[in-house]
Amino acid sequence: MLSRCKKGVAFDLDREKITWVAKQRPEWMVYQADSLYCIKNNIDTGLKFNFIDIDPYGSSLEYVIEFLKSSIERDDHFIIVANDGLRDKLKIQAWEVKILKKAILKFGNNSIYKSYLGIVNWMINEFCIETNHELSRFGGYYCGKNNNMTHYIAEIKKGASAP
């Protein structure tokens, strides 16, 4: 997948990690920064993004919705990948996660942990509809200790008509 992406952006607060990313992807825009802050403030990099790598050490969904709502320049077809660390908290405290409120009302609190990847897919699709985008492909898997991390990829088209 990365070989198809000629330009992109990566954010991370960890200096060592972001230095490694910059060496691996020299043609990308790479920031040691709080990505949510940058997205909310419509970071201007001078290029249209086509690949975004989100690694928030918690919920990634706030980042996705803020990016979709933003005026940040992007290609008509772009990719978001995320390393989402929220799943562990969902075992006992899903109801505390504000961004999951709509999903909890639809699917129930007890469904959130065991079906989290499907919930993320559904929520990103909802965000896309709300912001005039189309989710064209979604995939992911659980990993890490006790499968409490979630890695996913979302391919999104800009300006698609909501169904």
Where are these regions (language model features)?
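SAM-dependent transferase fold signal centered on methyltransferase-like domains
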Residues: 1-163
